[in-house]
Design a protein with these regions (language model features):
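C-terminal motif of bacterial Sec signal peptides marking the signal peptidase cleavage site
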Residues: 15-18
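Bacterial N-terminal signal peptides that target proteins for export
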Residues: 1-8
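Short amphipathic, basic-aromatic surface patches that mediate peripheral association
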Residues: 52-64
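A short, structured loop/turn motif at beta-sheet edges
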Residues: 43-46, 79, 125-130, 155-158
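Post-signal peptide N-terminal segment of mature Sec-exported envelope proteins
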Residues: 28-53
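Glycine-rich, aromatic-bearing surface loops/beta-hairpins
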Residues: 27, 148-187
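Bacterial signal peptide processing site
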Residues: 20-23
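Mid-length scaffold segments of soluble, non-membrane domains
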Residues: 68, 75-146
């Protein structure tokens, strides 16, 4: 009986000593044929989940008379963002010019129509081949440089993407409330 108790204490001491011995336990397990499986390649990982929030202002996409109207928002899943960031606004008004500008980086495009004051919140799925989630707001009179954004997919997955859509500009925030609009001039 005393031998069994001594053996149990010895085994417990060895196990506890292995916890602080820089992977000796892992090496021992590997020697017996037990090891941690290798990390999956990106193509085999499940798609990323991104909390997407589009918050439209009551004064959304104002026309020349100052009246709010519906806004087409395009959501892009891209491999890279270079072509997206270099394309002029007019390229996004024509499907063929859009495809030509984005080339092989374009994985998927989807259009969402927003009405003034609407909140659109959804969990968007991004395949691992998508490096960026990009958005274009097709305003009637877009403010210079405030009608598109591209966010790294990993960042979007981690904190979500909140966009405020206003009279002629888009604001980008990572929290549940859209960032405030700085002063911009509508064209």
């Amino acid at each position: 009986m005393r031998t069994i108790s001594s053996l149990a204490i010895l085994v417990a001491a060895c196990v506890l000593a292995g916890c602080g011995s820089n992977g000796l336990a892992a090496k021992a397990m590997e020697a017996t044929g037990l090891r941690k499986p290798p990390e999956l390649p990106d193509a085999q990982k499940p798609p990323r989940s991104v909390a997407l929030r589009l918050h439209a202002s009551p004064k959304l996409n104002v026309d020349k008379r100052g009246q709010p109207i519906a806004l087409a928002v395009r959501l892009y899943k891209l491999r890279q963002k270079d072509g997206f960031e270099q394309a002029p606004y007019a390229a996004f008004l024509n499907p063929q010019a859009e495809r030509d500008s984005l080339g092989p980086d374009l994985l998927e495009v989807r259009e969402i129509m927003l009405v003034p004051g609407q909140r659109y919140e959804v969990t968007e799925k991004l395949g691992r081949e998508a490096g960026y989630l990009a958005v274009v707001a097709l305003f009637q009179r877009p403010a210079e440089g405030r009608w598109r954004t591209a966010v790294p997919a990993a960042d979007a997955e981690r904190s979500g993407l909140t966009l405020g859509l206003h009279a002629c500009a888009m604001t980008v925030g990572g929290s549940s409330e859209a960032a405030t609009l700085s002063s911009v001039r509508c064209q």
